[in-house]
Amino acid sequence: MAAEEAEVVSPLIVDTAPDTSGTAAASLAAAVSAAAAAARTGSQAQVSKAALAAKLMSLSGVFAVHKPKGPTSAELLNRLKEKLLAEAGLPSPEWNKRQKQTLKVGHGGTLDSAAQGVLVVGIGRGTKMLTSMLSGSKRYIATGELGKATDTLDSTGKVTEEKPYDKITQEDIEGILQKFTGNIMQVPPLYSALKKDGQRLSTLMKRGETVEARPARPVTVHSISLLKYQPPFFTLDVECGGGFYIRSLVSDIGKELSSCATVLELTRTKQGPFTLAQHALPEDRWTINDIAQSLKRCTSLLPEELTFKKSKSEPSSDQALSCGYITLRETKREDDTVKTL
C-alpha cells in the first residue's frame, strides 16, 4: 500500500490506461513517444515496436510465472524486465537500485534459488498490491532426506550432522504430522531473508559471522500429507500460511523422529489463486501479449463483487483490506517482503 491516499484497486485488474505518475513512468512514456514518432515515418516493424511499447506501458496487475531452479527471485525479475523491454524496443536499464527504473515489476513472496514453482509478479500499479499475496495460503511439494542435516536446511548447504534412520517407518512419519498442523510455533532458519542490523541473516552467515537463532514465532499449517516414503526419502504435500518455512518443517520432522532431515527438492505448486499447472507462465511465454492475456485470465479468477475499499488515511503496518468476501491483512514481516525492481 502506498503511504499517500490513493485509489485502491483489485490486484488482478488490468488497467486500460498507462500509469504515467512519477519519474519512472514519465521516462518510459518519453521512450514510447519517441518510438511512436519514429514509427510515423518508418517501417512497419517500427510501427509494431511502438504499439508493443504502448501496450507494455498499459500493463498493470498481478500474474504468475514459473521460477526454475537456479536463479534467485530477484534475478528472475531482472530477466523478465529485460525480455519485455527488448521486445518493445526500449532500452534496458542499468540494474542500479539508486536509479529510478522505467518499468516497475515486483514479486510477492520469495522462492529460494534451489526451489522452483509459482512466483507471483506484479507489474505497474499491481506492485502496490503484492503485500496482500504474502499472507495468503501457499502450497508446496517437498522431498526431504532423513539421516542428514545441513547448515542451510537444504541440499545447497554443508552437512553438519548424520544420524540413523533405518528404523523409521511410514507409519512413524504419518503419526507425527498432526503435531505440525494448525497454529504452531516455528523457529525460522538462519539462512533466510530475516534481517539483523539491516542485513539478511543468510548474507551474514555466508560471510562467516556468528548469527544467533531467532525465537520461535506463530505460523499456520492448513494441511500436511505424506505422498511417498522410500527411505531415506519422503515427499510431503503442505498447504500453509505466510511466513512459514518448509526447510524448518522438514528439519523439525527429522528431529521429532529422533533423527535429522534436510530438503532435497522444493516446488511451490500454488500461491493464492494461482497454480503452477494452470497459471504460471514459463519463460518462453514471457511476452507482452502473453502477459496481457494472463492478467485478464487472473482477473477472471475473482468474483465480480470483489472490490477494495479506498483508504482515506495513511495505512498502518498492519492494515486490513476489506472486500466482498474476504479480508486480507497486510502484515509486514521481515521475511515476507515485497520485492520491487
From Swiss-Prot:
Keywords: Acetylation, Cytoplasm, Isomerase, mRNA processing, Nucleus, tRNA processing. GO terms for cellular component: cytosol; nucleus. It catalyses: a uridine in mRNA = a pseudouridine in mRNA; a uridine in tRNA = a pseudouridine in tRNA; uridine(55) in tRNA = pseudouridine(55) in tRNA. The keyword Cytoplasm applies. It comes from the Eukaryota. Gene3D superfamilies: Pseudouridine synthase. The active site is at D112 (nucleophile). It is an enzyme of class 5 (isomerase). The keyword Acetylation applies. The modification N-acetylalanine is found at A2. NCBIfam families: TruB. PANTHER family: PSEUDOURIDYLATE SYNTHASE TRUB1, TRNA-PSEUDOURIDINE SYNTHASE. This is Pseudouridylate synthase TRUB1. The lineage of its organism: Eukaryota, Metazoa, Chordata, Craniata, Vertebrata.
